[in-house]
């Protein structure tokens, strides 16, 4: 039931497959992310690019796995190693917002404590608007308050195209 409450903080309360939501507890994952309904608010840590807050929903031993390998990121990072990646976003983005993609229902396996989400990300950057998609697979701790393992599969074509724009931007400045 705890995972359902976490997801109710992400998703609208009118999803028929979920039991009615209880009042979220203070330490729940999505509350830490600044999510309401099915979107992370403009006041949330992703929008503000507040690195400590973004990582606050990960347990101290959380691992982050990023795919596809063509992105050139290490296949496995610790929470501490992930900090530099998130910090680097502040150099390029003015804001960044994540939301569950319209029409994409989450996959929730409470006994296994796993959640699968299809996410869309949008933000304003040095080189214009950035829009992308991710699939997140989250392994949640027994209390339902922290992510123990964070698997993300990113849209590599969009990221590559945006990376080329960033390179061109900095080349033009030099």
Curated annotation (Swiss-Prot):
Pathway named in the protein's UniProt entry: Secondary metabolite biosynthesis; terpenoid biosynthesis
GO process annotations (BP): austinol biosynthetic process; dehydroaustinol biosynthetic process; terpenoid biosynthetic process
Membrane spanning stretches: none
Deleted gene: phenotype: Impairs the synthesis of austinol and dehydroaustinol and accumulates (5'R)-isoaustinone.
Top-level taxon of origin: Eukaryota
Subunit structure: Homodimer.
Family, per entry: Belongs to the trt14 isomerase family.
Cited function: Part of the gene cluster B that mediates the biosynthesis of austinol and dehydroaustinol, two fungal meroterpenoids. The first step of the pathway is the synthesis of 3,5-dimethylorsellinic acid by the polyketide synthase ausA. 3,5-dimethylorsellinic acid is then prenylated by the polyprenyl transferase ausN. Further epoxidation by the FAD-dependent monooxygenase ausM and cyclization by the probable terpene cyclase ausL lead to the formation of protoaustinoid A.
Misc note: In A.calidoustus, the austinoid gene cluster lies on a contiguous DNA region, while clusters from E.nidulans and P.brasilianum are split in their respective genomes. Genetic rearrangements provoked variability among the clusters and E.nidulans produces the least number of austionoid derivatives with the end products austinol and dehydroaustinol, while P.brasilianum can produce until acetoxydehydroaustin, and A.calidoustus produces the highest number of identified derivatives.
Protein name: Austinoid biosynthesis clusters protein H
Species name: Emericella nidulans (strain FGSC A4 / ATCC 38163 / CBS 112.46 / NRRL 194 / M139) (Aspergillus nidulans)
Lineage: Eukaryota, Fungi, Dikarya, Ascomycota, Pezizomycotina
Gene: ausH
